[in-house]
Amino acid sequence: MAAVARGAASAGGEVIGVVPGSDPGEANPDCTHVVATGIGHARNLAVVASGEVVVAIGGEWGTLSEIGHARSIGRTVVALRSWTLGGRDRMEGAPGVIQAETAEEAVAAALAEL
């Protein structure tokens, strides 16, 4: 997330950080606006519900939970070298999941879903 925030900020974009704790200071310094939720991992649902398309980049357990939340509320997920759920071939063709190999592919796929 830090690299995404840095890239967006360096391009002049506004960066909204949604942090799990109640301290806005835990946000990345590149965040323009911070939402300190104080709700721990439950903030993952707030993050995915706030957008129209979810782009999952790489990821650990939190990313996997965000993918699950996104699909459970009907959000399309663009997976950029992200979770494969048992192998890339099993994720390919999964309803509501679009695979991307590059950032450009991910952005194009996300914009096409809007």
PLM regions: where:
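Acidic/glycine-enriched connector segments
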Residues: 1-75, 83-89
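Mg2+-dependent phosphoryl-transfer enzymes with acidic/Ser/Thr/Gly-rich catalytic loops
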Residues: 50, 89-100
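Short acidic-hydrophobic, aromatic-tinged amphipathic segments that line or gate anion-handling sites
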Residues: 34-38, 95-109
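Conserved catalytic/cofactor-binding microenvironments
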Residues: 80
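Short, hydrophobic alpha-helical segments
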Residues: 110-114
